[in-house]
Amino acid sequence: MDYSYLNSYDSCVAAMEASAYGDFGACSQPGGFQYSPLRPAFPAAGPPCPALGSSNCALGALRDHQPAPYSAVPYKFFPEPSGLHEKRKQRRIRTTFTSAQLKELERVFAETHYPDIYTREELALKIDLTEARVQVWFQNRRAKFRKQERAATAKGAAGATGAKKGEARCSSEDDDSKESTCSHTPDSTASLPPPPPAPSLASPLLSPSPLPAALGSGPGPQPLKGALWAGVAGGGGGGPGTGAAELLKAWQPAEPGPGPFSGVLSSFHRKPGPALKTNLF
């Protein structure tokens, strides 16, 4: 074999420095080297170059034999995150129970809320379900039962509280109604009309002139006026009651007739003593 080209290293380096990567046209390879990542790692060699005496041809051959990066990496080498999302989106199909299955499940649940494995397997074979589905149904049914119990307890407590509040409100209303009834009940004494004031005889009896003028229409003992007033002033020889009685008898007309003070004189004639005593003295 010919190893003479090994001694031409110095000349090749000198030629490379002189050309400064100038022209690769001297090489028998196709003109213009183009890099492509899809090129095979070891492309087929072109026509053989002459011995490495030519520096341009040797440099082109070295660059042509470099492997392309990622040329052997297959497409979609790394897994995409969409695959994980697809797995997460997979959901179990919801089990639909028939009326016969629900009837059997409710019957067993009424007997026990926590059936053992044997009871669940027997029930699953009977209603054509898996034991896992039966177990999940009992778990959901127990949760629903507890929720119903809590709701019933809360409703009962609310009803008891409302009843207590209603009783307290009724008692307060009863008290208020009693107070209002007592306050608005009319008093028996207040409902009665006030008694008429007792007529005072001091002014008509002690004044000598107005009384005869008022009684002038009817007959009266006019000649005895001075004697009667003198008897009243002096006591009439007896007590004050005797003088008052004599006065009334003297002033009473001989024949009954209508007069303005006939009713008053008749009432005082029935009760002559205390009233005249209080009014006159």
From Swiss-Prot:
Bias-annotated ranges (Low complexity): 153-163, 200-216
GO biological process: locus ceruleus development; midbrain development; noradrenergic neuron differentiation; oculomotor nerve formation; parasympathetic nervous system development; positive regulation of transcription by RNA polymerase II; regulation of respiratory gaseous exchange; regulation of transcription by RNA polymerase II
A Pfam family the protein falls into: Homeodomain
Domain of life: Eukaryota
UniProt region (Disordered), positions on chain: 145-219
GO MF entries: DNA-binding transcription activator activity, RNA polymerase II-specific; DNA-binding transcription factor activity, RNA polymerase II-specific; RNA polymerase II cis-regulatory region sequence-specific DNA binding; RNA polymerase II transcription regulatory region sequence-specific DNA binding; sequence-specific double-stranded DNA binding
Primary location: nucleus
Entry-linked SUPFAM superfamilies: Homeodomain-like
Claim: Hydrolase is one of the keywords in the record: no
Signal peptide annotation: none
Start-end of Polar residues biased regions: 180-189
Tissue specificity statement from the Swiss-Prot or TrEMBL entry: Expressed in sympathetic superior cervical ganglia and in noradrenergic, dopamine beta-hydroxylase (DBH)-positive tissues. Not expressed in brain.
Residue ranges of the annotated DNA-binding region, renumbered to this chain: 90-149
PROSITE patterns noted in UniProt: HOMEOBOX_1, HOMEOBOX_2
A single GO cellular-component term on record: chromatin
Subcellular location: Nucleus
Keyword vocabulary terms for this entry: Activator, DNA-binding, Homeobox, Nucleus, Transcription, Transcription regulation
Family: Belongs to the paired homeobox family.
Function: May be involved in regulating the specificity of expression of the catecholamine biosynthetic genes. Acts as a transcription activator/factor. Could maintain the noradrenergic phenotype.
Official protein name in the record: Paired mesoderm homeobox protein 2A
Gene: Phox2a
